[in-house]
Amino acid sequence: MNMNAWIRVANLAELMPDGLGIAVKADGIGIALFQWEGRVHAVEDICPHLGFPLSEGIVQEGEVICGWDGWHVCLDDGSCRREKQKAKVFPVEVRGEEIWVRI
């Protein structure tokens, strides 16, 4: 794996409406992409609590809520409301219609 590499993961047209996620892969890493309030966010697609896919959750007030266990994960920094555990977040760039994530 090439750390700090930018990888194209999706097109803007593939994103769901605000608050819903999609699952993508970047160099073998599962990533949940969310569009929220005009920005694209990328979070590792694993809930820090029980390991369920965050891409199946919904976003409310800047946090993805895991659809399996109800944990809240901040899209900006990966912090969790209930514990000190964190989800990994990835920098995102939108280049034209393409979404790129730095891993």
Predicted regions mapped to residue ranges:
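N-terminal pre-ligand scaffold of iron-sulfur
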Residues: M1-E61, L75, K88-I103
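Flexible, gly/pro- and Lys/Arg-enriched active-site loops
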Residues: C80-K86
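Short cysteine clusters
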Residues: C47, C66-D69
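Short, glycine/charged-enriched secondary-structure capping and boundary segments
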Residues: E61-G62, R81
